[in-house]
Design a protein with these regions (language model features):
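Beta-strand-centric surfaces of beta-sandwich/beta-rich domains
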Residues: 1-192, 198-300
């Protein structure tokens, strides 16, 4: 993307940069790496693929349900259709929901390398969208972040996808030290989960991913007991976890908005969803493949 001048002070909204690929055929990605141009001021970069309008919309195999946050000790209630949309919660992280995540960068995150037979697709004519979160520190800067991609030499057997299980419907009261926020995904096809990536801000304490099988059996597949906002990473399973059709992936997170949290920007404030680091997010990213589905050809 073009260079961006970062002011010395102030709050900077997420910046979006569009980079046409000019690809005349579909490309498959075996690996990718984002390099921040100004690591003093770049908090994270998310590179997504915005493809031309497909002739046949891709079926959605993941259904996300946020669970309404509850007071400590109370039972969580499912969100309703009348609940406020994410934009009303103060953030725009969902505003590009039609784009497919390609590769991310934040401090602590490794560049993904997919095994042979797997890959992410960039359809011909697509545009790469760089979402960049800048922070200020009293000194100006200039950033021109970039992405490097390794193309597959052959069409993979399966397409790798990135999903996110998120809940923007919360308000963390001042002084609460163990506030719970939950969300879940339900799968309409057999899927294999390959990796997970918890995302919260400074009040985030821990996050747990639990697989719930169609027969009701539960299995904790990832627990991050001490979330570190300054070191975010992907957690890859030793082998992919098969979740049969009808399974759920349940994500539960806890937040500390008390004075005991040394990183708390302001324990006197009620905290809601928002892009900035003094606000909060609850996102459980995960990487998956759909079983029994071959990677789409260029003609699709």
């Amino acid at each position: 993307p073009t260079a961006y001048d970062i002011p010395a002070r102030g709050t900077i909204a997420y910046q979006y940069f569009e980079v046409p690929t000019n690809f005349t055929e579909d490309k498959w990605i075996q690996a990718g790496e984002v390099r921040a141009g100004d690591r003093k001021h770049v908090h994270h970069v998310i590179v997504s693929v915005r493809e031309p309008q497909p002739a046949t919309p891709r079926p959605n195999v993941v259904s996300i349900r946020p669970i309404l946050a509850s007071a400590p000790g109370a039972a969580a209630a499912p969100a309703t259709a009348s609940a406020a949309p994410p934009a009303a919660a103060g953030g725009n992280a969902f505003s590009r929901a039609g784009d497919a995540t390609l590769v991310n960068w934040a401090v602590g995150e490794d560049a993904p390398v997919f095994q042979r037979g797997l890959g992410k697709r960039i359809p011909k004519g697509s545009t790469l969208i760089f979402q960049v979160h800048y922070t200020t520190d009293g000194t100006p800067g200039t950033d021109r972040s970039k992405v490097g991609l390794v193309f597959s030499k052959e069409t993979p057997r399966q397409e790798v996808r990135t999903g996110m299980i998120a809940n923007p419907l919360f308000a963390i009261p001042p002084g609460v030290s163990d506030y719970q926020i939950d969300a879940e995904a339900t799968f309409s096809e057999d899927v294999s989960v390959w990796s997970m990536h918890p995302h919260m801000h400074y009040r985030g304490k821990d996050m747990t991913y639990t697989a719930i099988y169609p027969d009701g059996r539960r299995e904790i597949i990832l627990r991050v007991p001490k979330f570190d906002f300054g070191w975010q990473t992907d957690y890859w399973l030793a082998k992919p976890l098969l979740l049969p059709k009808g399974s759920k992936l349940y994500v539960s997170a806890h937040y500390d908005n008390s004075t005991a949290n040394r990183n708390n920007p302001d324990p006197t404030k009620t905290v809601r969803w928002g892009d900035q680091t003094w606000e909060e997010m609850m996102i459980g990213y995960f990487t998956y493949t759909v079983e029994g589905k071959a990677a789409p050809s260029s003609a699709q």
